[in-house]
Amino acid sequence: IDPPMKGDKTSLDYYKAQLQLKVLDVLRDHYGVDVSDAALREAVERHNRLCRAVTAIGDFRKLENPPITGYEYHVIVLVSQVCPHDLILPYLEETLKELQTRQPEPVFPFRARVVVAGSEIDDPEFTKLLEMCGAMVVADRYCFGGFPGREEIEIREGEAAFDAICRHYLHHNQCVRFMDGGKIDQRHQELLRLVREYRADGVIYESMKFCEFWSYEKVLASHVLQQEMGIPCCTIEKEYNLGSVGQLRTRFQAFVESLEIKKLGTEKEGKL
C-alpha cells in the first residue's frame, strides 16, 4: 500500500482506491473473504467493542494510584492486536471487570509518570525496563501503542462502511509520515492532551535506529514540548531488539531524577 502523506479529500480518495485494489479485492478474490457492506459493518462493531474494552482498561492509568502497570497494559494492547477479536474479547472484558475490584499498592510504587512516544515498540520488556527505573508509563503514543488507534469507528448515516473505515484511519492516523502542518500540530496537541489527562510528569521520545521519520519528529516535537509547552522530554534512539540496556537504564534513571527534582522545586515554590 502507498499511503498518502496528507489528510485532504484527494488523499482520502487515493487511500480508498489503494485499499480497494490491494486489500479488499485480494481478500475477496484469492481468499474468499466476505467484504460486503454488511460484513464490514459487523467487523466494525466487533472492532468498536474491543476498542471500548481496551480504552476502559487504559483509563485506569489516569488514577493517582492505578491498579494496573504500564507493562501490563502494553501486553494487553499487543494481545488485542494479534488475536482474533472473537477469541480475545471475552478475556479483555473479564480483565476489565477484575481491574474494577483490584486493589492497588498502598502507596504509588513509582517515582514519576511518563508518556512514551515514538517508533514501534512491540517488546513489553522495554516498558518493564522503564518502569524498573521508577517511571510508570501512563500513556503509550507509539507505533503499536494505545494512542491513537483505539477510537471507535463512526459510520455516518447513509455512508458505506468501507468509506467510513478509510475516513477514520486517514483522519485519526497520526503517523509521522504525514508532513502537512495540520497533522504536525495535531500530533503536538495530542501529546499535550495525554500529558494533561494522564497527569504525566514528562515525555520520553524514542526512535528506532534508521527510522528517519521519527528521528526528525523527535527533534522537532521535543523542542516544541519543552520550549513552548514547558513539558520535560527525554529523547533516545534504540535498536529493534532491546540492546544497550545499561545505557538506557542510565538515561531513564537520570530523567526520572530530574523529574523528581522539578516536582520538589514546584512544591517548594507553592509553599512560599
PLM feature segments, named:
Residues 16, 23-152, 180:
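A charged, amphipathic alpha-helical module
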